């Protein structure tokens, strides 16, 4: 099966592996998921990641009673509660408190308990407690018993695993968690302009187009499906590069260590056999 790359602007209605762009925010589907996660609408790439995940899972039939999903590095994601409210059984994983980045804990990005994952009361508490369980998990060493799920996901987590190679290895290893025909949805950082110089190791890395192309080629060679779209938008906010201290309203691209990055979502369908 050849590797498929789309060159037209990415759509939010039928997402593939693609970058965050302004046009995707300006759709009824995006605004629907904003309401579902109880976030005010704004042009922010982190909000795009939440909505991208939910749109992919919804469009692929994964948000239904009886489905099972596992999330990595979930922090305090409201997506867990949205899934549970629709009858999905969820295993939410994160680092233990001692291993978690201190900054994550201090900025409220780390879940200390199940209650943190339903703090907005998106899902009835009784339903949430029945469908959601939490466990400690190192993304660099996925437990072999995390198997049999319909889908697996992470939101801007695997760029924090130490280097580019470890991040890409996590994506491939997470395939072991899902059933044949299952779905992976992972978001991370994309270098907007450089396919060579980048942040390739340390607390955060920025993946390049060639990194995702290499990953996709390996996955497709194994029979999996991964359609790529690296087309970046050309609207006003697509051209705007936020600089530190970052804003909360115009934050699709940002300057980080001399590079310009945005969010990129990976969507991989596991081979049937």
Tell where the protein language model's regions lie, with residue ranges.
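Core SAM-dependent methyltransferase catalytic element
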Residues: 222, 236-273
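Conserved class I S-adenosyl-L-methionine
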Residues: 62-75, 82, 91
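A short, conserved alpha-helix within the catalytic core of class I
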Residues: 160-174
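Short catalytic micro-motifs in class I SAM-dependent methyltransferases
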Residues: 153-160, 189
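Class I SAM-dependent methyltransferase Rossmann-like catalytic core
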Residues: 4-64
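Conserved beta-strand signature within the Rossmann-like core of class I S-adenosyl-L-methionine
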Residues: 181-189
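A short acidic, Gly/Pro-enriched loop at the edge of an enzyme's catalytic core
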Residues: 137-152
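Conserved Class I S-adenosyl-L-methionine
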Residues: 195-231
């Amino acid at each position: 099966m050849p590797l498929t790359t789309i060159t037209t602007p990415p759509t939010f209605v039928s997402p593939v592996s693609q970058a965050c762009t302004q046009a995707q925010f300006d759709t009824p589907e995006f605004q629907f998921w904003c309401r579902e996660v109880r976030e005010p609408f704004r042009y922010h790439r982190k909000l795009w990641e939440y909505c991208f995940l939910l749109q992919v899972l919804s469009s692929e039939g994964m948000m239904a009673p009886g489905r099972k999903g596992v999330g990595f590095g979930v922090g305090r994601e409201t997506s867990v509660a949205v899934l549970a409210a629709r009858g999905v059984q969820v295993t939410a994983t994160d680092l233990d408190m001692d291993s978690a980045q201190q900054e994550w804990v201090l900025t409220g990005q780390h879940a200390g308990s199940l209650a943190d994952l339903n703090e907005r009361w998106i899902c009835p508490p009784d339903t949430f407690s029945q469908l959601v369980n939490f466990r400690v998990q190192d993304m660099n060493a996925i437990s072999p018993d995390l198997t049999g799920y319909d889908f697996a996901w992470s939101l801007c987590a695997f760029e924090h695993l130490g280097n580019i190679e470890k991040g890409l290895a996590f994506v491939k290893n997470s395939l072991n968690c899902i059933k044949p025909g299952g779905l992976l949805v992972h978001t991370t950082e994309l270098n907007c302009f450089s396919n060579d110089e980048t942040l390739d190791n340390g607390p955060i890395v920025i993946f390049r187009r060639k990194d995702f192309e290499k990953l996709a080629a390996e996955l497709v060679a194994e029979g999996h499906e991964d359609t790529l779209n690296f087309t970046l938008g050309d609207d006003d906010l697509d051209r705007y590069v936020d600089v530190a201290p970052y804003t909360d309203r115009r934050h699709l691209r940002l300057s980080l260590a001399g590079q310009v990055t945005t969010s990129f979502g990976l969507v991989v369908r596991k081979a049937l056999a």
